[in-house]
């Protein structure tokens, strides 16, 4: 498994001087280190994880966001048992995100497994912008408990102020 920290550090749980320096200078975050160590620990027990590349990690509240390559996201989402194992390892809610994705794709990852019908950027008279996302009523019922988390994650990670519009079926 490829991670933001070197393989030896991810396996041993301690940082070498090079990775320690990257952490100190801000090239790495504590979440990158934690995510790398936990996923490497899991990859020792599950060979499917060896093929993946973790680009970076972020934490928003109790939620852990793991940013992978686009091809890795599809693979992970097709393996429900593997996803459950990852969530157990991180002791909570894990969001799989595509690294370096444009805002629309970022929002699609947050709203997964439902589909976003429309997304529009609205410029308000006071100068700030709001992104409006449209979902169907049927889909909204699947994620209604997560909407506040989705809004908070979008705001903290990409500075997207989100407005969710629900359309009747």
Task: Name every feature range the model reports, one short phrase each.
Residues 1-169:
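RNA-contacting regions in translation and RNA-metabolism proteins
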């Amino acid at each position: 498994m490829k991670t933001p920290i070197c393989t030896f550090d991810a396996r041993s749980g301690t940082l070498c001087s090079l990775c320690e320096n990257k952490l100190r200078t801000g090239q790495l975050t504590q979440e990158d280190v934690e995510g790398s160590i936990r996923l490497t620990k899991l990859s020792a027990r599950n060979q499917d994880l060896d093929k993946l590349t973790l680009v970076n990690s972020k934490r928003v509240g109790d939620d852990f966001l793991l940013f992978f390559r686009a091809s890795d996201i599809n693979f992970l989402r097709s393996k429900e048992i593997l996803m459950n194992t990852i969530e157990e390892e991180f002791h909570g809610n894990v969001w799989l995100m595509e690294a370096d994705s444009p805002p629309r794709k970022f929002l699609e990852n947050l709203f997964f497994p439902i589909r976003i019908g429309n997304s529009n950027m609205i410029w308000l008279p006071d100068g700030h912008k709001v992104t409006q996302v449209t979902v169907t009523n049927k889909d909204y019922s699947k994620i209604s408990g997560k909407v506040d988390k989705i809004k908070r994650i979008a705001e903290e990670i990409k500075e997207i102020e989100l407005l969710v519009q629900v359309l009747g079926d």
